[in-house]
């Protein structure tokens, strides 16, 4: 089982798909990485040689932010927005949609379950 960026890649999947198990790598980045490493997209994870795994590791470490580093960067940028007092930071703090969506109706995922209003019944 190949272990890249602290993630165990599944054995029986194609490398193009297996790399997407790493946070921060989607299908497009996976294809770019495999092209740079000169590995076929259809190669299964368990068919890789150690040299090929090391090539993928070095490409990811050198060119891409993944896993913990990416998560930390995202949370730090959100924290920066909150500290500066930007509108987007306030929306993050209140748990509301950040990108201008309507909130009168909808936005239930971001706002959470409905809260009952006491004293509304007659």
Curated annotation (Swiss-Prot):
Any single GO BP term: translation
Spell out the family assignment given in the record's similarity comment. Belongs to the universal ribosomal protein uS13 family.
Family annotation (PANTHER family): 30S RIBOSOMAL PROTEIN S13/40S RIBOSOMAL PROTEIN S18, SMALL RIBOSOMAL SUBUNIT PROTEIN US13M
| UniProt xrefs under Pfam families | Ribosomal_S13 (PF00416)
Q: What is the lineage of its organism?
A: Bacteria, Pseudomonadati, Thermodesulfobacteriota, Syntrophia, Syntrophales
State whether it acts alone or in a complex, and with which partners, per the record. Part of the 30S ribosomal subunit. Forms a loose heterodimer with protein S19. Forms two bridges to the 50S subunit in the 70S ribosome.
Query: Molecular function terms in GO for this entry?
Result: rRNA binding; structural constituent of ribosome; tRNA binding
- Keyword list, A-Z: Ribonucleoprotein, Ribosomal protein, RNA-binding, rRNA-binding, tRNA-binding
- Cellular component GO terms held in the UniProt record: cytosol; small ribosomal subunit
User: What is the protein name given in its UniProt record?
Assistant: Small ribosomal subunit protein uS13
| Listed InterPro entries | Rbsml_uS13_C, Ribosomal_uS13, Ribosomal_uS13-like_H2TH, Ribosomal_uS13_bac-type, Ribosomal_uS13_CS
Region: Disordered, residue numbers: 94-122
